[in-house]
């Protein structure tokens, strides 16, 4: 009799544990995978961490800091560090100063992404880029800028939805269009390229369209001495749509305009006004 009760109890216990296990798996399946680390960190979306059941990593507490009882306002905190060693032999065919030991390029960034409900967003990314050990010191523009805001912008969302959204972005921002062959944040060097200006981001069905007008940021080597370049203006429209019949393929349509007041040519210095249309 006792053994019969034991078997019955074990049977119902296994049923309960199985149901609880299924419920747990179902809850986990509703949580999306964490986003990949993007070249532009503002493209990472951690809003899914609003659901406490989706928090699986100790760092998730920094990726979603709840502000307010409703949870539709939150702060994301992140950062990255890059150490890059370069060494050359017979640089420029041995002409000029040579460096037999190489040099170190170090870049450290921290950022904060503040979402005020669904319509307003503030994003700021503070960066320190320094060079150590290079014969002749850091190269201008690309090697060193001790402390500066590489990005500091506000987003205003005019329309929101999976099939149709419109965002206006104001402030300092990085651009990365299409595959990055024409316009990218210049990740290869130590000091990345940013722009001060305005951008409109429109997503309709499978189209991603971005219109912008901005000035490139000219970095100094010190602290907070980055400012827009008064001699250059950059504007345009860039549209991207995936091609479903080609795996990983896209179609890009773009117009880019560039005005340089003091462009350097072989025969002198003058204004350059360039218009580029392509696909």
Question: What do these predicted ranges mean?
Answer:
Residues 1-8:
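N-terminal secretory signal peptides that target proteins for export/translocation
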Residues 9-21:
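Bacterial N-terminal signal peptides
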Residues 21-100, 111, 117, 139-141:
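N-terminal periplasmic/intermembrane-space "pro-region" immediately following the signal or transit peptide
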Residues 71, 100-104, 143-148, 190-192, ...:
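Short sequence motifs at beta-strands and strand-loop junctions characteristic
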Residues 162-168, 181-279:
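Signature for the C-terminal beta-barrel architecture of outer-membrane proteins
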């Amino acid at each position: 009799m006792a053994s019969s009760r034991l078997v019955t109890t074990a049977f119902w216990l296994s049923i309960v544990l199985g149901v609880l296990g299924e419920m747990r798996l179902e809850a986990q399946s509703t949580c999306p995978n964490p986003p990949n680390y993007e070249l532009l960190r503002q493209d990472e979306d951690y809003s899914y961490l609003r659901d406490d059941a989706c928090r699986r990593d100790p760092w998730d507490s920094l990726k979603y800091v709840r502000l307010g009882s409703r949870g539709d306002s939150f702060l994301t905190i992140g950062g990255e560090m890059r150490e890059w060693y370069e060494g050359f032999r017979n640089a420029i065919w041995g002409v000029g100063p040579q460096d037999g030991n190489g040099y170190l390029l170090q870049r450290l960034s921290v950022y904060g992404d503040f979402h005020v409900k669904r319509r307003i967003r503030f994003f700021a990314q503070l960066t320190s880029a320094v060079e150590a050990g290079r014969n002749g010191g850091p190269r201008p523009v690309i090697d060193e800028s001790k402390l500066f805001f590489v990005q500091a912008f506000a987003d205003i969302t005019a329309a929101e939805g999976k099939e149709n959204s419109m965002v206006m972005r104001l402030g300092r921002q990085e651009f990365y269009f299409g595959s990055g062959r024409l316009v990218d944040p210049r990740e290869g060097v130590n000091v990345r390229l940013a722009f001060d200006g305005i951008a409109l981001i429109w997503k309709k069905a499978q189209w991603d369209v971005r219109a912008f007008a901005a000035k490139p940021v000219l970095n100094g080597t010190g602290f907070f001495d980055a400012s827009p370049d008064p001699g250059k203006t950059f504007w345009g429209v860039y549209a991207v749509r995936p091609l479903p019949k080609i795996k990983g393929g896209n179609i890009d349509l773009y117009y880019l305009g560039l005005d340089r007041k003091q462009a350097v040519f072989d025969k002198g210095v003058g204004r350059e006004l360039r218009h580029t249309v392509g696909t």
